Amino acid sequence: MQPTNPNQFTEKAWEAIVRTTDVAKQAQHQQIESEHLFLALLQEPGLALNILKKAGLEAAQLQQFTERFIARQPKVSGGNQSVYLGRSLDQLLDQADQFRKDFGDEFISVEHLILSFPRDSRFGRLLSQEFKVDEKQLRQIIQQIRGSQKVTDQNPEGKYEALEKYGRDLTEMARRGKLDPVIGRDDEIRRTIQILSRRTKNNPVLIGEPGVGKTAIAEGLAQRIINGDVPQSLKDRRLIALDMGALIAGAKFRGEFEERLKAVLKEVTDSEGIIILFIDEIHTVVGAGAVQGSMDAGNLLKPMLARGELRCIGATTLDEYRQYIEKDAALERRFQQVFVDQPTVEDTISILRGLKERYEVHHGVRISDNALVAAAVLSTRYISDRFLPDKAIDLVDESAARLKMEITSKPEELDEIDRKILQLEMERLSLQKESDLASQERLQRLEKELADLKEEQRSLSSQWQAEKDVITDIQSVKEEIDQVNLLIQQAERDYDLNKAAELKYGKLTELQRKLNEMEGGLATTHTSGKSLLREEVTEVDIAEIISKWTGIPVSKLVESEMQKLLNLDEELHQRVIGQEEAVSAVADAIQRSRAGLSDPKRPIASFIFLGPTGVGKTELAKALAAYLFDTEDAMIRIDMSEYMEKHAVSRLIGAPPGYVGYDEGGQLTEAVRRRPYSVILFDEIEKAHPDVFNVMLQILDDGRVTDSRGRTVDFKNTILILTSNIGSQYILDVAGDDSRYEEMRSRVTEALRANFRPEFLNRVDETIIFHSLRKDQLQQIVRIQLHRLEERLSDRKLSLSMSPEAIDFLVEIGFDPVYGARPLKRVIQRELETAIAKAILRGQFSDGDTIQVAVENERLVFKAIATPTAVPLS
């Protein structure tokens, strides 16, 4: 038979024949023989290698044998490089064609070629003798792989063992102990088993939010099947998870995807109920593989699902179920819904306790029970956009990974010594070049110090290595215990009770004793205070990871921070002058929050700041942001003058569907989603349209708002500050007259009620009235402003000295009770900053000078005083 017609062969078989030419040319052979074809088949992973592997043959050994055989054949060098079909290959192809007819196939496939080799009188005979391969064995393997399928197209290899290619056997993974234990979820698993036991429409679909444990329910069912903890109708069944991505990937031509899916479904139906399919993200089935004029996967599944021929478990989220499956009513009625709710905090703690051992073995650290409780409780409170138990498991996992990283990194004490040694060695090199007596004495002292440090370094290094080795040994023992427990379970399943008892009371007991000894030794090192490494995850680690994720300071208060919090009002007073009531109210709110006593279902605090312009309303918000986040930029500032139209509310929470900017989200909601812990300043609220405040009712009361895309944005860790100038004329009327304070307060409150609705005002924690500023307070503000100017001057190596008269002069011309401190800022800019700038440009001041400012003839005068250069100490 001449292999000139590719239409007689499948794609893979023809590719192998084409490669045969290259193999022969590389070996400098003029005739293509059967050995060249065999080597070409070995070089391409696929069906040929799979058949030979199942026959117990190693690909590497086969390749070596074939290459040695080819190397022994006579070579032809020079002349024409064309190759001809050899007699052995011609006969082999004829034999393959005969096998094709025997099998009832339409094309010569790879399996026909492989099956022909034992009948090859040239290379095949030697191969059979060397590796004990016979035709009968190969035929059985091919029948097993092909099942009842015939070669009816040119790509049949893609349809063989389709489930093995495109699925994962969950029951096999459960048998090998590869699945995590599933704790709880008994009701959902029971309902799934109940639906699977039906005669028709026996297809449960698990519906729930992402991360609540839908896939875990399928894994739990696989574990129950292995343990025999299922009804008779599910005994010895195989649960296979279908990988839709692998099924679609690489399907280049129309109809190729459908062929693959049909092959999978055929294997499932041929198993006569033994195989149960699990399709994670089942919504991907709807529309999968659909191109013009071809069917999608959902339509291929429908007939089998309805008749009960195919038992399938699906899993998808609520949104995707609504979006894809509910639209297809015919597909929806074939599935029975099983709702999977988010577990409670208590259930999550139980789940974490069940998984704890797996994570301890993986990371090689211990996880305290307090850490598990903290992960469940804190993730519920602070991570609102994800679901339990997923977010709590992630916290424990990342905390353990972080601690493992610390164990393998160099301890701080050792790192410090290493740096010091490096520094001293550099100093020693420098001193060795000096010959004077002082340098020689210093060198001797340095040598002694270096020797002591190196000794300490050796001691600490060996201690660190020893501790690291103990922790690694503990991990190895835990892994061994894990393996022994798995063997015990397998022995109990097989009713091999002698083996189970031998392992449980022999090997397992010995390993447990060994583990207890090692952990006891490590605990003694820790309690003695000599330990360099920490190997237990605590609640502090969990809190630190939450802080990293969200920016919310959840970690326990250390002594220095407690002191800082107690002095918070004093710190704020240094920046905001003359507003004791406002500063105290804000400081109290922060102290309540950090002590953990604020209401977890509302924002940390919400204030309305009322007062005339320039008295420190916005400045207090900036000071607070600077204290909490070390930068004023962390404040989310919303200028309400931009929200004067009714429709502008969409800018806060996002444009509704169908409008331009829908995908961008809202200015407020997106900022808070990215930074859940922040100070939000709504400046000049009286300028905004009244309807804008309807959005704020939920924020102030429940600490949450739903944006235009239906996502709940959490405001529970924010401080809301709203500023307004309403009633400022009444505040100015009583400036400095404390006896009329109550009268002024009631008039300001009336003005506020006239402008805002009661349901809005009633939700704000506190309305604070800022007083107009007095002259003596302006003096303090001048000093603050001058301090900032001094910081800017220090960049030019200049310092500033102001006489008391100069400060009084600035206050006098900058004082205006109506406009507050802002005119003062302009006066400093005009009278002081501009004059200094001009003097610098004229060259009046040089580096290191002190600028002395005094008053003469009702104007500021400047004098340069040279600062003496510092004499270095010998």
Curated annotation (Swiss-Prot):
The Clp repeat (R) domain probably functions as a substrate-discriminating domain, recruiting aggregated proteins to the ClpB hexamer and/or stabilizing bound proteins. The NBD2 domain is responsible for oligomerization, whereas the NBD1 domain stabilizes the hexamer probably in an ATP-dependent manner. The movement of the coiled-coil domain is essential for ClpB ability to rescue proteins from an aggregated state, probably by pulling apart large aggregated proteins, which are bound between the coiled-coils motifs of adjacent ClpB subunits in the functional hexamer. One of its GO terms (cellular component) is cytoplasm. It comes from Synechococcus elongatus (strain ATCC 33912 / PCC 7942 / FACHB-805). Residues 773-874 are annotated as: C-terminal. Residues 343-551 are annotated as: Linker. This is Chaperone protein ClpB 1. Residues 161-342 are annotated as: NBD1. Residues 393-527 form a coiled coil. It comes from the Bacteria. The gene is clpB1. Belongs to the ClpA/ClpB family. Part of a stress-induced multi-chaperone system, it is involved in the recovery of the cell from heat-induced damage, in cooperation with DnaK, DnaJ and GrpE. Acts before DnaK, in the processing of protein aggregates. Protein binding stimulates the ATPase activity; ATP hydrolysis unfolds the denatured protein aggregates, which probably helps expose new hydrophobic binding sites on the surface of ClpB-bound aggregates, contributing to the solubilization and refolding of denatured protein aggregates by DnaK. Necessary for thermotolerance. InterPro entries: AAA+_ATPase, ATPase_AAA_core, Chaperonin_ClpB, Clp_ATPase_C, Clp_N_dom_sf, Clp_R_dom, ClpA/B, ClpA/B_CS1. The lineage of its organism: Bacteria, Bacillati, Cyanobacteriota, Cyanophyceae, Synechococcales. Pfam families: AAA, AAA_2, AAA_lid_9, Clp_N, ClpB_D2-small. ATP 1 binds at G208, E209, P210, G211, V212, G213, K214, T215. ATP 2 binds at G611, P612, T613, G614, V615, G616, K617, T618.
